[in-house]
Regions:
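Extracytoplasmic low-complexity, Pro/Thr/Ser/Ala/Gly-rich segments
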Residues: 48-126, 248-258
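Surface-exposed amphipathic alpha-helical segments
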Residues: 229-258
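A small/polar (G/S/T-enriched), proline-flanked helix-loop surface module common
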Residues: 85-211, 218
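Short, well-structured beta-strand
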Residues: 208-235
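Sec-dependent bacterial lipoprotein signal peptides
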Residues: 1-37
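Bacterial lipoprotein signal-peptidase II cleavage site
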Residues: 35, 39-53
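Second-shell loop/turn segments in exported
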Residues: 63-65, 130-138, 234-239
Length: 258
């Protein structure tokens, strides 16, 4: 999503919320994608057992094709009533964002091991949005290093640093990033076993004299030579778990089958 470089003509709280909604696109398309890309660029080490049966079954699997991955991501029928989908729009800054994240965390870039990548529509309802993606890789070692990366103590602070820098450059004139916090937690958080980590983030921006909180979540999912994710963003309040958890479970169930 493109963020205009100049301040909008309309002023007041309503316009501030509109800017916050646009910032969701910046962070979803750049920050969360960069975390996953950096996870795919980590130095291999023994993964946590939280990767479960997905890591074990992938040793004999063939990488999923694009057509297979498209069936794993969220479909319009998966969303509750009222959510409207729009085609995924790639962010032209993804490569630069990924490079910055890799440099911060440390590791090798394994983008060359990607076989295919699919994205769902970007689903929206009011100030909230939900999206998902699934990527296949050539080897089991890619998944093992990625799961290990999610345990790195550098991951959350590097994500925060990158997010603040990216958002600061995207705000309208006079806008400021008051705070940004991100926490990546290994494990399924009580969800499906192939959810290997979850992340939450809170961004507070001040636009047109109004301070607005933006909330993010991400679920990191594995399958046979597959990495998938479900991302959510909302202005003002986090999306309820009653909405998010079933969607994560749906993608996880598809990914684990490969």
């Amino acid at each position: 999503m493109t963020i205009p470089s100049s301040a909008p003509q309309q002023q007041g709280p309503a316009r501030g919320v509109q800017w916050a909604k646009r910032l969701l696109g910046v962070c979803a398309a750049g920050c969360v994608v960069a975390v996953l890309a950096a996870c795919g660029s980590s130095s291999p080490k023994t993964p946590s057992t939280s990767s479960g049966s997905a890591a074990t079954s992938s040793s004999a699997a063939a990488p999923a094709s694009l057509s297979q991955l498209k069936t794993m991501v969220l479909q319009p029928a998966d969303l509750p009533s009222g959510w409207k989908g729009a085609p995924y729009q790639p962010n032209p800054n993804d490569s630069a964002t990924n490079a910055a994240m890799v440099k911060c965390v440390g590791g090798r870039n394994s983008d060359g091991d990607k076989v295919a990548e699919a994205h769902s529509d970007d689903f929206a309802l009011g100030d909230a949005s939900i999206s998902s993606s699934a990527t296949s890789y050539r080897s089991q070692s890619d998944l093992e290093s990625d799961v290990a990366m999610l345990h790195s103590p550098k991951l959350s602070p590097c994500f925060e640093q990158m997010m603040k820098k990216q958002l600061a450059a995207s705000l309208p004139a006079g806008g400021t990033v008051k705070s940004a916090s991100v926490k990546i937690t290994p494990g399924s958080a009580g969800g499906p076993a192939n959810v290997v980590a979850t992340g939450t983030g809170t961004i507070k921006v001040q636009v047109n004299g109004q301070q607005i909180p933006v909330y993010l979540t991400v679920a990191f999912i594995t399958g046979p030579l597959i990495q998938a994710e479900v991302d959510t963003e909302n202005v003002g309040t986090p999306l309820p778990a009653s909405v998010v958890n079933p969607l994560v479970a749906t993608v996880a169930a598809r990914a684990v089958k490969g």
